[in-house]
Curated annotation (Swiss-Prot):
It comes from the Bacteria. PANTHER family: 39S RIBOSOMAL PROTEIN L12, LARGE RIBOSOMAL SUBUNIT PROTEIN BL12M. This is Large ribosomal subunit protein bL12. Belongs to the bacterial ribosomal protein bL12 family. It holds the Pfam family Ribosomal_L12_N. GO terms for biological process: translation. Homodimer. Part of the ribosomal stalk of the 50S ribosomal subunit. Forms a multimeric L10(L12)X complex, where L10 forms an elongated spine to which 2 to 4 L12 dimers bind in a sequential fashion. Binds GTP-bound translation factors. One of its GO terms (cellular component) is cytosolic large ribosomal subunit.
Length: 127
């Protein structure tokens, strides 16, 4: 029997026969129907979408220091108050998840930091 033939046979079943088929498949293979999981997951996705729309705190992440590493280090020191070695180490982490220049800042402050870093030649991402 081909898959198409199986689908045709399933299409001809009544609702009660489909319910019985699902029950037998669950018992036979030790699984449960996925529909309740999908229904439960839907509100979570909606909540995540709402949270993104209302985002008020941002992380400033250095993606690349570009051609002018020294200038980017100077700007990072100015923004963060780090020492020279710490700022250099942070700039050299560009492109990694650890390259967070500042976290939990307002949108305005994040945009200002991004502008300063981009003027120094860096590539920056706001999350």
């Amino acid at each position: 029997m081909t898959i198409d033939e199986i689908v045709e046979a399933i299409e001809k079943l009544t609702v009660s026969e489909l319910a019985e088929l699902v029950k037998k498949l669950e018992d036979k293979f030790g699984v449960t129907a996925a529909a309740p999981v999908a229904v439960a997951a839907a509100p979570v996705a909606g909540a995540a979408g709402a949270a993104q729309e209302e985002k008020t705190e941002f992380d400033v992440i250095l993606k690349s220091f570009g051609q002018n590493k020294v200038q980017v280090i100077k700007v990072v020191r100015e923004i963060t108050g780090l020492g020279l070695k710490e700022a250099k180490d942070l700039v050299e982490k560009a492109g990694t998840p650890d390259a967070v220049i500042k976290s939990g800042v307002s949108k305005e402050e994040a945009e200002e930091i991004k502008k300063k870093l981009e003027e120094a030649g860096a590539e920056v991402e706001l999350k």
